[in-house]
Amino acid sequence: MKKLFLFLILLFSFTAIVNAKGVQAKKYNHIVSLTLSGDEMLLGLIPENRIAGLSGKINGDKEISNIVDKAKKFPKVEGNEEVLISLEPDLIIVADWLTKRIDDIGTMTGAKVYIYKTPSSYEEQKKLIRDLANLVEEKENGEKIIKNMDNRLKALQNKIAKNYKGAKPRILLYTSFGTTSGKNTTFNDMVKLINGTNVVAEAGIDRFKDISKEKVIELNPDIIIVPIAKKYDNVDKISKLFYEDSSFKNVKAIKNKKVYFMQYKDITPISQYMIDGIEELAKVVYQFKE
C-alpha cells in the first residue's frame, strides 16, 4: 500500500512538472484581444488554450471576419469591462486606434497591455506579426506565417508578369459612403504590389478621404473597386449610381464596365489575411480564373 501511495505521489509530481513545462513555460497564457485583427493574428500564432477571450461579435461576421468558425468557442469581450476583468487576462492586445480607456485597462486587470501600431503597408503588417510572435514566444510560428505570405505574393507577382503585358491598371477605391483610400493605406500598398496604380495616391491624396463625383471623373480610372458587405449594401443600387449617371459615361471604368465589387474583408485585412486580400484584388483586376 505504501509503495502504491509513493508511486501515485511520484506520478502526480511528474505530471505537474510536465504540465508546467508544457503550458506555464510561456510568459502569457491568458491572452485577450480587443480587435478583429488581433483576434486573427492570435489564432494564427498561438494554441487556443492560451487565448482567454476575443474582441466580439464582429469576428463572427463572415462579411468582415476571416475566422468565423474558429472564433465561436471564445468569450467575446465587446468592450465590456466586467467581462474583461472576469477573464483574468495576463496580456491584452489592442490597436492604437482603440484609445478609449486604454490607460485604465492595465490597472483594472493587472495585465500587460500591448498597443500595436495599425499597419499601413504589407511590410508593416509582417513586422507586426513578427513583433507579436516574439511577444507571445511563438517566433517560429510567426516566421512560418510570414514565409507563407511572401511565397504566395511572389507566386502572384510572377503570374501577373507572365500573363499581363499592358500598361499598369489605374485603380480607384470608392466606397458606398463616397470615401476613398490614398497614400499611406494598406489598399494603396496592395495595388502597388499587384503592379497597379492607385489614382488617388497618384493625385497626392493621403489616407482616407471623401471623394466627389467630379474628382472621380477627373481621375478617370480604368477600374473602380467598391468594397461591400452584402447584407448591408445593395449592389444593384450602387451599380446604378455609376451606370445610370450620364456624367460618368466617359469614365473608362464605367465605359468598359469595370466597376467591381469586393467584400470588405478582402480590402481591409490588417492581419496575415492581407495576402488573401492581395490575391483577391489581383483576381478581380486582372480577371484571373480560379
Give the location of each predicted region:
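Sec-dependent N-terminal signal peptides
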Residues: 4-13
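Boundary at the C-terminal end of the N-terminal hydrophobic targeting segment
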Residues: 18-25
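Structured C-terminal subdomain patch of bacterial secreted/periplasmic proteins
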Residues: 29-30, 34, 123-136, 143, ...
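His/Asp/Glu-enriched short active-site or ligand-binding loop at hydrolase and phosphoryl-transfer sites
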Residues: 55, 62, 186-208, 228, ...
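Proline-aspartate-enriched helix->loop->beta-strand connector
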Residues: 81-97, 111, 212-229
